[in-house]
Every structure is written in C-alpha cells, then in structure tokens.
C-alpha cells in the first residue's frame, strides 16, 4: 500500500513516475510484481496498448523464445507453461462502447494474442446507467468478433472469481489465445473524489448494490468454513494498522524536486545525425509514407 499511496499523493519517492502521474493510474516495472504499463486517463485507452504488448509477446515467442524480456523474478523458466507471459487488460463495462476497445478486441481475435480482457460490470459508466450507455454487456458484445473465449462470473463472489481467473490464466498461458471475463460487480464507492455517488445515485440504487458487497459475503463464507471471529478481527486490525502506518509515512514523504521535471521525458539516443549510404545513390527523394506504399 505504501508505494501506491506515494503515487496517489504525487510524492517524489513514487516509484512509478516520481509523483508525476494521474492519480490511481499506477504503473510498475519492479521484478517482484507483474509489470503495469503507463496508461492514459481517457476511457478505454488501455485496451490498444495492452493488446500491443500481447502482440509483442507473440512476436518475441516466434522470433526469440528465450528473450530476457520475458524474465520476471528469480524463478523464470521459459519452457514451463505456467511461466508463459500473458497480458491482462482491466476495463469497466461502459468503456466497451469506446472505439479503441473494439479495435483491440478485433486485433486480439484476428492474431490470437495471449491477452485477458477483464471487464468489471457494475451497471454504471461514471454517472451514466447501463440502459443509457449500451445495448449489451461485454460478454454478449464480444460474440460478434469470434476467436475470443468468454465467460461471465459473479465478481462479488471471491471464491468463484479466484477459481475462474486461475483457470482462465492457465488456459491463456497454455493455449495462447484471447479471453474475455465479464465480472458482475457492485458499485459501492465514488467514481472519483469529484464524481461522488450521492450526486447521481438514489438511496434505492445504493442499497441494491450494497447487497452484493463482497466483503461481508467473504466473511460469512470464511466463518462457515471454520475461521473464527477472533482470527478475522486479528487480520482486520493488523491490516488497518499497516494501512494507517503506511499512510502516515506517505503523507510526510518528500515532494517531487522541481528541477527534475524534465527527466525521463525522452529516451536517450546516440543517433543525432544521418549517416551511411543512400540506396540507390542519387535517387529522387520521396515521402516516407509514399515509400511504405
């Protein structure tokens, strides 16, 4: 939580972007966790870049199966099925109406890329209801593409979600094809600190969603399985204390240094001038786009 809090508070020690990223859109490149790429804040814009990463993975697998680019952590074994790299693209249900998402789905299906599209369907698109935004849910929508496996689950059921996602991840690692998971989930909080739930949602709608709050569902299931109330309280108290400590430390962490604002904007390059022989020599110059055609 501490690293995410640094990012949320735009602190200089933020390992994602040094405190210069749109909040709650973290990215990460450490060896101890899955890589999270940088994304735009525009709705659905993560779909095309993540599909591009999946395309890159497929290309690397075909051209250089043992590339170091695949390595993650100290136990990587490229020949092991459970170590085959995959991509996960997380989306909200309303974002599926965006053109970029359709492009990504089309491309992933056409080229059979190792990507999972995880759609969290809470029936809202920021302040717009599903009835106002779309005709079908993501699972129904993706049927038209072909080549993409799909499944719908109760995303408020932790056990079901864990089991299904494990199976989906295993299948995509093994079969190397795209998969869409449509998880029906409640909307319990605000969209952002500025788009607050009480601005556009009725008490009846909120009450309906609270019935599917996954936390009490999981708590009830754990007690049925024999976990004691004391054990649960101990976990909750320890977690709350850890979060409070991390937050206190994040609040007092140093701010970004103004003089470093231009760092890492451009990738350093040693190529600063044109060198070499043009072929054919003295040929008429053409536009790059025309040459490609």
Where are the regions a protein language model picked out?
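N-terminal amphipathic, basic-rich helices that act as targeting or association modules
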Residues: 1, 283-293
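Cofactor-binding active-site loop characterized by glycine-rich and histidine/acidic residues
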Residues: 1-76, 81-111, 129-139, 143-146
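Conserved thiamine diphosphate
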Residues: 58-61, 135-167, 210-237
